[in-house]
Amino acid sequence: MSLTTEVQDTKLSFRRFKDGDTKVKRWQDSIFQASWSHKCPTYIQSTPPCQGSCPSGEDIRGYLNIVRGIEKPPMGADGKPVMPWQEYAWRRLTEANPLPAVMGRVCPAPCETGCNRNQVEDHVGINSVEHFLGEYAIQNNLQFKKPEKLTGKKVAVIGGGPAGLSAAYQLALKGHAVTIFDEHEFLGGMMRYGIPGYRTPRDVLDAEIQRILNLGVVARTKTRIGTDVTLAQLREDFDAVFLGLGAQAGRSLPIEGDKNATDAPNVVTATAFLKAFNDGRLRHVGKRVVVVGGGDTSMDVATVARRLGHITDAKPTDWEGAIAGKMAQDVADVSARQGAEVVLTSVFTTDKMLASKHEIEHAQAEGIEIMGGWMPVGVVKGADGRATALKVAQCEAKMAGGKLEIKQIAGSEKDLPADLIVSAIGQAVDFTGLEEFDNGKGGLTADRNYQVQNKPGVFAGGDVIRPHLLTTAIGHGAIAADGIDQY
């Protein structure tokens, strides 16, 4: 290699190039010919884009390196690995996320969107690796390691969904005594009562929840804070409180100028519909179902309705009563069941819908018609007060300044016949008994460490702060646990 005697007289920044000069030149000339250049690449330590895109904060590069064999499990005194590489990778993964088998199935994987390999060919199958490691742990009965010392501090976790379970897990690892309070019969929150069971198998969900409880976490189900137990009692009995209430109250259709548009018994919310299905009350629906939404929840509703199908001559009150929680349907004869005609409308065009691309593709593959660029403008009712159709109109929707702007196209209205209309346009928090936390915007206000504003010792996370992904709720719980530990 020949070197020049050229002396670099231009002052360079620490990045080894002139500020403002971002044009890529021939690196070979600079590396091998200029005496002032470095002979090897310069590496800058920064968060990998996959990890930066993961709301749970998983050490993705870490466990992928273990799976690839780059990082080996530690050796024991006998010169053999102290554990299989699968367990080693699982333990690295669960430092942040205690529910990999569930998340490997339902997470839309924003980490894969941020993956560098997208610039070359396609992303690394991070979600599939997570799924595999979660299944391996269940099949081999892997358990979390209990803390060596206990702090003597007690923490109450309100809500047994992903945020509450994540917070309880992290707090238990830190040595705190944790009690989870949940109004339902079983823990899991939206993972159990919001996502269809065929996407989150109950045996898998139960196994991962039980592993958290095995750390010494106590669960008090069928207990609603604010009615069965007051918050004042909790503050007296516990050193800190975490609010993971979730957002399990659905939002009604936004029909302007008609307050009674959604009072028909066959116009329901997505949360009520999915809970009725997951509870086993809902066994079939009407022949024609219209779903209003565009996010992942609306895709769940549409696919469930399509799979449930309808039964000829079934009474409409059958499914209406089941969704309202008044009764359960008899098991329908499979041979008599036919697929429901399901239409999903969204104010956004299909390519701009909020649902994950693969969720949209799955829905279309199941025969669901997706109408992008249509907004609900009215509900057509019959003489009995039941809805017979949803009136929709074409529209143009865009986000401006963080707000949704929808422009209706005049003269484009039409009716979509419907036996059942489901509103899947968002969720709200039920603050019954805890009204003091309602900020008037459908949630509560917390600081960057997820401590509730003006409420020392009270922390929060998950949908109660911002209805979003399960992985976001898990991340909130972990950050709040750190705050509680410091508190």
Which residue ranges define each predicted feature?
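Active-site rim loops that border cofactor/substrate pockets in soluble metabolic enzymes
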Residues: 388-409
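A conserved short coil-to-beta-strand element within the FAD-binding core of flavoproteins
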Residues: 221-235, 373-385, 395-398
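Beta1-alpha1 glycine-rich phosphate/pyrophosphate-binding loop at the start
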Residues: 49, 58-81, 90-92, 119-127, ...
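Rossmann-like dinucleotide/flavin-binding elements
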Residues: 157-181, 221-230, 249-250, 271-355, ...
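Ferredoxin-type iron-sulfur electron-transfer modules and their immediate structural context
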Residues: 1-154, 202, 241-260, 271, ...
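A glycine- and small/hydrophobic-rich beta-loop-beta segment
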Residues: 332, 367-371, 375-377, 381-389, ...
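ANL superfamily adenylate-forming
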Residues: 262-274
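Alpha-helix C-terminal capping/helix-to-coil transition sites in glycosyltransferase folds
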Residues: 236-237, 417
